[in-house]
Amino acid sequence: MNEDTLFLACTRPATFAGVTMEGMALNVMATSILFILTSNFTMIGLGIGLHFVLREVTKYDHNQFRVLFAWLNTRGKQKNLTRWGGGSTSPLRLIRTYKELNR
């Protein structure tokens, strides 16, 4: 997969200065909220610093934020996670080990 540069180039998400659009959305929202709450222009500098942190997060895997949002949409929203013992609801008992399978 890493050797096929055309495939990687065609499937790479859109970025702004090395940060994916999902990461930029988080950065802009957090910086804007902090700026509105504090009315301090140094929060814009904090947003620039946060941009470099997000750039390091997505440096090696550009799908980090997509994985995070997929986790939040599936397992993160489960209100009865302890009852079912998993990320999706199923009426069937979850078999965790091979010994439980043989019962």
From Swiss-Prot:
Protein localization: Cell outer membrane
GO CC, one annotated term: cell outer membrane
Domain of life: Bacteria
Keyword Mitochondrion carried by entry: no
InterPro entries: T4SS_VirB3/TrbD/AvhB (IPR007792)
Chain ranges passing through the membrane: 33-53
UniProt keyword terms in alphabetical order: Cell outer membrane, Membrane, Transmembrane, Transmembrane helix, Transport, Virulence
Location, primary (coarse class): membrane
Membrane topology, from the record: Single-pass membrane protein
Family indicated by similarity: Belongs to the virB3 family.
Entry function: Component of the type IV secretion system VirB/VirD4 which could be a major virulence determinant for subversion of human endothelial cell (HEC) function. VirB3 may play a role in stabilization of pilus structure.
Subunit structure: Interacts with the 17 kDa antigen protein that is encoded within the VirB locus.
Protein name: Type IV secretion system protein virB3
